[in-house]
Amino acid sequence: MSPYISPLFSITMIMSVMLISSSGHWVFMWLGLELGTLAFIPILVWWHSSLEVEATVKYFIVQAMAAAVFFLGGMVSLSGDFMGGVNQLMGNIGDMMIMLAVVTKLGLAPFHYWVVDVVQGLNYIPGAVLLTWQKVPGLAVLTQLATCNNSSMLLLFGMVSALVGGLGGLGQTQMRKLLAFSSISHLGWLVVGCVAGSLLGLSYFTLYVVLSIPLFSILHMLNGGHLNQLRTGLMFNPLMSVLLGVGFLSLGGLPPFFGFFGKWLLLTHFVGQLLLGVSVVLITGTLISLFYYLRVSYLCIVVLGPQQIMSGLNWRKMQLSGLMSGLLVLNMLGLFLVGGASCLPK
């Protein structure tokens, strides 16, 4: 792809989010979602491999079907304005169809199966964009829908996603699939945060992006698609091993790392609102997902291969950008942020 064209797609994706955020009408929401989808599709096939083409076709089919349901839901809701006594019923049906379409576009459970297959076929860079920035348009729509009567349904989708994301990643040895299930779990927390308040959702999303981008960048440099390949790539990179292991622990929300701060913010809000059931389900999903985070971190930090023990080979150095190093060091500041936030006046 020409370097002069790729910024155009990036700007278009940003404009799609601005269009959704600045309008409360379903037509402009639909236009914003589809504008972002069309701008993102060329990025998916950046390296032109057969797996990327297959993943792009799957992504396009799912997004097109969800877009059709979204548009149909908007028309059903609009038709209720002209049908007198059934106005409320038609409006509720239309809102439900719109919500299901957005949930499918985001990949929330139980409409999450396409996310795993698509991410598995992508390179790490477009996969990172899919699991981070491409969630913003859908989350912006859900934030506006949460002000209606759909908040309880969105809470249910969020809790189910947190559990499915934890359970689905338990037996995975493919790093891309593991990251996909991790994203589904975090997406559940994100949706619950959007229901609790747009500021909480934005805070959690920012933390997730800050934690995810360095991990995707390191995995892209190592080109490790399988846990065994990852171990081989890390064998002569001790600094990279520690940083990657700490990054996964932080992404799992384990104290005292940075990722714990985001979950602590949401849990304190729900406990304050006496939503203990939601808190228990989210914590359960996180504890389950911690199993595969710990497995990867153990592989990165603790396990030493026989070649490392028996041979005196020099360690191979891999350069890290200053920004990435700073973001990974930030992972260690979780408890300091929690302590500082606790001292703030209520």
Curated annotation (Swiss-Prot):
- Tell me what topology the record assigns in the membrane: Multi-pass membrane protein
Cellular component GO terms held in the UniProt record:
mitochondrial inner membrane; respiratory chain complex I
Example GO molecular function term?
NADH dehydrogenase (ubiquinone) activity
Q: Where are the transmembrane segments?
A: 1-21, 26-46, 60-80, 96-116, 122-142, 151-171, 178-198, 199-219, 242-262, 274-294, 320-340
Name the domain of life this protein comes from: Eukaryota
Reaction(s) this enzyme catalyzes, per UniProt? a ubiquinone + NADH + 5 H(+)(in) = a ubiquinol + NAD(+) + 4 H(+)(out)
Gene Ontology BP, a term? mitochondrial electron transport, NADH to ubiquinone
Subcellular location per UniProt equals: Mitochondrion inner membrane
Question: Which EC numbers does the record give?
Answer: 7.1.1.2
UniProt record similarity statement: Belongs to the complex I subunit 2 family.
Q: What does this protein do?
A: Core subunit of the mitochondrial membrane respiratory chain NADH dehydrogenase (Complex I) that is believed to belong to the minimal assembly required for catalysis. Complex I functions in the transfer of electrons from NADH to the respiratory chain. The immediate electron acceptor for the enzyme is believed to be ubiquinone.
**Protein's recorded name:** NADH-ubiquinone oxidoreductase chain 2
Q: Which organism is it from?
A: Branchiostoma floridae
